[in-house]
């Protein structure tokens, strides 16, 4: 493309300038350097004095390239005339340029003398096309404004959905290429390569025509090395490398409106280059607003990221073809409502939560039942204080056994089947208690009930953690705790009007609706994947997410997570638990369980009536227990509304601080009362403190340890680790409830509450420094973060579709 250096005294007839026909006008070029700015000229080819029009052409059609066999003629010595060589040179030049859009000017316009050549050269230098630095800067501004600012901004606003609404062929290719996330990534890269060149002004290439005609001094026509990158092979296109930074782009935007208005005046529907470029861009950009739209019904698959709003930048669009009546139908899915309104997902959460209501009823049973059970006018057998303590304490002890066995059960039987299997033991246990003729029958019934409670308390959070979407896992994940509190409230209210036997019959009826609803919901997809039953996993996930949801991305993530866990798993489950990556989430879960029970909540629930009797409150003790139960119930529903807004840790902070204040207050009240002072004026204080204490506990430390157990434990060890955590929880429950009376006798009621308050202070520090926030994260994200690997959060929310015609 560039000739040899020449002296100023070359023959203009033999080595004349050439004029290149671009289709938009003519531009003058030389072999030493083609004026960069001529690519936007529209001049009169016959009049070098005409004023150039800048910005007349936005896009450029490919310019035909000639072969690289054309020899460059060596210039004659200065002053030498070679008229006979003119015809030969012209013939060779025309032969080498065959197929190129190059036209020679009339040769008689140039003088044959050296003086004439110099005049012509000066005339050309004076009028050549925008070769000054000022005009080059203008070119850069034009390119930056029109290419970078306009189209790139529009494209980024509409994002990458590479659908061609004008060509069914392009759409069908995209549909095939977007069948999976990996395929889509490859398709997306191709799309980035073929998208409109104006989207990135840093990488714009133009082809110049090859011209064999040498020019004069190279120093007069030195190309701008800051803008041009010239390959050794002159047949390759010249690359214009525009270094556009943010500051330059911002500065350029100030003149964008003027340039755009000028550009719009120059646009023409008859311009073939513009039409070609526009069609290409229409194929690449998102949801063209072109009037030439397809009549087909198109449906986009988009994904909702995070917990609060759509994150279009990181969302991956998915498109699939739906067959209707044997004919392909293209439809578009758009994210619409909150996942909380997917009724199948809510039904699954409600079904397992009814089991939690039975658990809550079982836990609260001893508080109202022991009073009537010790009454010989009601009970045919004697219940001593020692046997009464075992009626309250044997349930958590049996729950310990249930927690230990529950881990293997949910792995081998499945999450759903394990929960379902607890219904029958619940019914049998309550019937044993209701029909008891000896305290031993009551103990056996309580033990069987406690075993079922241990299994259920382990399997319920695991089931919900594996089926509910991350966006609403906090809200729906707290439903078991809320229904557990309903069970507690129901037991307290019924206990005011029923004796221990009637309460037991009521308890036997509660598992029946729970049993029936459990048959309607599926097993968790993750358990199916762990058993190699991917087809069943897909069906279960489809049921949970809705019939029209695209579950492929989520299913793929579940399978990948399971495969990663399998690669790092050992033969021994205990060895897996002891691995550093698994030990950290297990210890956090154990810590939460420890501080939950050592806050004294179960001791308070089990002995609520007795505590109010000891306090000497003027309010009826049974009414006090009902009030506490109502507050417990309401607080949990408040937590369900706040947990996905404030996060897990914030609710734990609030919960811990509330318990610390109220436990210390209760300790102070009992200290003053036991010292012999009159506390009748503040008889309301125990109830107020209890209400705030239960309110604080139910907001955080009540439901969140169980919720986070199902979230932070790795999938491969979730069953065994949850078994350990549940067993540990019930061990702490047993220790607290069984020793509560002994601790009161040893250090007094006031000392007992102060002890629990001090433990809550330590629990607050534990939450601050060790407990992670899991709000809005998928189980796979949480697992990778707990293992120390950082990854981009991915979340799959398959939303009810909204179809519209384009």
UniProtKB/Swiss-Prot annotation:
Cytoplasmic side: 1-339, 411-424, 469-473, 523-585, 644-649, 703-723, 772-806
Ranges that cross the membrane: 340-360, 390-410, 425-445, 448-468, 474-494, 502-522, 586-606, 623-643, 650-670, 682-702, 724-744, 751-771
One GO cellular component, as annotated: plasma membrane
Keywords associated with the record: Cell membrane, Glycoprotein, Membrane, Sugar transport, Transmembrane, Transmembrane helix, Transport
A Pfam family that the UniProt record links to this protein: Sugar_tr
Gene Ontology MF term list: sugar transmembrane transporter activity; trehalose transmembrane transporter activity
Membrane topology note: Multi-pass membrane protein
Keyword Glycoprotein: yes
Listed PROSITE patterns: MFS, SUGAR_TRANSPORT_1, SUGAR_TRANSPORT_2
Primary localisation category: membrane
Known role: High-capacity facilitative transporter for trehalose. Does not transport maltose, sucrose or lactose. Mediates the bidirectional transfer of trehalose. Responsible for the transport of trehalose synthesized in the fat body and the incorporation of trehalose into other tissues that require a carbon source, thereby regulating trehalose levels in the hemolymph.
Family the UniProt entry places it in: Belongs to the major facilitator superfamily. Sugar transporter (TC 2.A.1.1) family. Trehalose transporter subfamily.
Entry protein name: Facilitated trehalose transporter Tret1
Originating gene: Tret1
